[in-house]
């Protein structure tokens, strides 16, 4: 493990209940791998859905955005900056994510132009 939750909070501004990445496992070049363990006690499950907890897809996308933000904002030249999620193309969800699951969050920066970063 490269960064735990305490380390991550020193890099990105997100806090409970909206901190959606637990660990950064590795950063190699333009690729980052993080993880999020899904617990039944998380706030989103109060309403999505009380009888059948399913992690909302938009929160999985946010977890990916936070993962890449840790990689980018941990660089010396980006310290003190904040990253904004501007859009997404072709998101697909292959199955439901439920309490007890562990999300592996893999992102790779493919292009950077005028301060905008493109990520797969």
Predicted segments — roles?
Residues 15-55:
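Catalytic strand-loop segment that frames the active site of acyl-thioester-processing enzymes
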